[in-house]
């Protein structure tokens, strides 16, 4: 993002070994960027760290405050590239993983960003399979699609209710479970008459498989960082989760589906758009 902001060719970041064209940029003025401010006002850009760990993660780490604490903290920024930072005031290590766009509603048939009409939370009755949806927007807002936090809840609830197995395949039939001509299952969250768009809102086995890959990338990145410093999840005192995937994440559900490490829920903190805050 820093490259695009200052108009520098970002090609090097896309090609192995993924080295940014610059790390720090000094002497930049508002006039250089045509910003609506005093043209001589200096502009500071959060420095790139390396590879896919850019200035947004520098800003997010600053906002999280983990750099100024004695306790060991984990900072997770959920997006198309998932970035992880681990450490305390003595050291910080980071890595990036290709999680794909599932956390932001991409690669999901009814996915969307966390805007009006997005299903951001869900519970499912184990007996009737009826879902209870929390939707972004006014109280009478009908669902339009599913955002990242909603996907986490839905998959966790489907697994808890025995509707899908650990591979994300539908193993229980019911009024909310439908199958296409090829036998692929889907769970209907809102029928055509219940949605804002007049189209069915559902989550299918391909959606679930895409999400399993995304959450697996995040968990693998966390394990990679911990292994690099010869530590286990027991060393984690705080977990800060960022990303524009909803107004909040049900951390228990995220742990249940193997997306986050199994630590005490009190250690989790959702901090929203940390890049903007930083």
Regions found by a protein language model. Give the residues of each.
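Glycine-rich phosphate-binding loops at beta-strand->alpha-helix junctions
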Residues: 1-4, 233-253
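Glycine-rich phosphate-binding loop of actin/hexokinase-like ATP-binding domains
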Residues: 8-26, 44-47, 59-150, 250-272
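Conserved catalytic cysteine-centered active-site region
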Residues: 28-51, 56
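Glycine-rich phosphate-binding/hydrolytic loop that grips phosphoryl groups
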Residues: 35, 52, 56-63, 212-216, ...
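Phosphate/ATP-binding catalytic cores across multiple sugar-kinase/actin-like superfamilies
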Residues: 57-60, 212-234
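Non-transmembrane, aqueous-exposed alpha-helical and coiled segments at domain scale
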Residues: 70-73, 129-132, 222, 229-234, ...
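Beta-strand segments within the central parallel beta-sheet cores of soluble alpha/beta enzyme folds
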Residues: 75-77, 169-173, 234-242
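Gly/charged contiguous loops adjacent to phosphate- or pyrophosphate-bearing nucleotide/cofactor binding elements
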Residues: 152-214
């Amino acid at each position: 993002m820093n490259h695009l902001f200052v108009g520098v060719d970002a090609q090097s970041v896309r090609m192995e070994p993924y080295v940014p064209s610059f790390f720090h940029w000094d002497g930049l003025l508002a006039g250089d960027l045509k910003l609506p401010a005093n043209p001589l006002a200096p502009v500071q850009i959060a420095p790139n760290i390396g590879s896919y760990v850019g200035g947004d993660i520098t800003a997010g780490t600053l906002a999280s405050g983990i750099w100024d604490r004695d306790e060991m903290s984990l900072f997770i920024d959920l997006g198309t590239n998932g970035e992880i930072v681990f450490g305390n005031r003595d050291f910080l290590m980071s890595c990036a993983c290709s999680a794909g766009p599932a956390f932001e509603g991409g690669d999901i048939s009814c996915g969307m960003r966390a805007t009006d009409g997005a299903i951001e939370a869900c519970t499912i009755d184990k007996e009737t399979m009826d879902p209870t949806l929390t939707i972004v927007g006014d109280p009478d807002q009908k669902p339009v699609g599913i955002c990242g936090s909603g996907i986490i809840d839905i998959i966790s609830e489907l697994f808890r209710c025995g509707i899908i197995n650990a591979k994300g395949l539908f193993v229980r039939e019911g009024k909310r479970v439908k199958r296409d001509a090829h036998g692929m299952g889907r769970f209907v969250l809102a029928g055509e008459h219940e949605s804002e768009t007049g189209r069915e809102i559902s989550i299918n086995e391909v959606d679930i498989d895409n999400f399993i890959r995304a959450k697996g990338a995040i968990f693998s990145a966390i394990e990679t960082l911990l292994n690099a410093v010869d530590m286990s999840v027991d060393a984690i005192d705080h977990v800060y989760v960022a990303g524009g995937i909803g107004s909040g994440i049900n951390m228990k559900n995220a742990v249940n589906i193997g997306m986050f490490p199994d630590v005490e829920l009190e250690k989790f903190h959702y901090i929203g758009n940390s890049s903007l805050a930083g």
